[in-house]
Regions:
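Catalytic cores of enzyme domains
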Residues: 13-43, 47-179
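TRNA-binding/sensing appendages of the translation machinery
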Residues: 1-17
């Protein structure tokens, strides 16, 4: 299945840009270090365990193209944390499907998501084990130094989508012919 068809099926907004158009700022790692989400040091794909931000930026810049997408989810109100978690889970499920579709089509890719990886019900880090699925684990855009607000502006994908909604962004970095 073509990646854009999968995004259309899930009513996700998307566009494609060149990786050189992405705005990187190592300072975005500071948001992770403040531990507002509670995953700093609690998930292998979150700082500090995910690696140095400079190395993640270098890895991202090694790709040519970026399929940028967003999912918009309705929530009860701006305090609906459970609704936000359900929405994040749905967004991460879409990222996993995109990765599988890309790999099935032999596309060398690296997906970046929103927030903690979420690939496992409980991250192996909590029990002191290594990551169970390092090939499927997802690093967040912010942990990789991506300026998501600038990304939204540059791509024309809205960052705010109305009252009682939450919007999540993802990027599938890839090499080769554009999708």
């Amino acid at each position: 299945m073509r990646l854009t068809k999968l995004l259309q099926k899930h009513s996700a907004g998307y566009t494609q840009i060149e990786v050189k158009e992405l705005s990187f700022d190592p300072g975005f790692r500071a948001a992770c270090e403040q531990n507002a989400c509670g995953f700093y040091g609690a998930c292998w794909m979150c700082p500090p365990d995910v690696g140095e931000v400079a190395a993640l930026i270098a890895r991202a810049k090694s790709f040519e193209h970026a399929l940028v997408f967003q999912t918009v989810h309705e929530i009860a109100d701006s305090f609906d944390i459970e609704g936000m978690h359900r929405a994040a889970k749905a967004h991460n499920h879409l990222i996993a499907r995109l990765r599988r579709a890309a790999e099935k089509n032999e596309i060398d890719c690296w997906p970046l998501g929103a927030g903690a990886c979420g690939g496992c019900k409980t991250c192996a880090k909590k029990s002191g084990e290594p990551c169970r699925h390092p090939g499927r684990a997802v690093v967040s855009l912010e942990a990789a130094g991506v300026d998501v607000v600038e990304l939204a502006k540059r791509t024309g994908l809205p960052y705010i989508n109305g009252k009682n909604t939450v919007t999540y962004f993802g990027v599938l970095l890839f090499r080769g012919a554009p999708e």
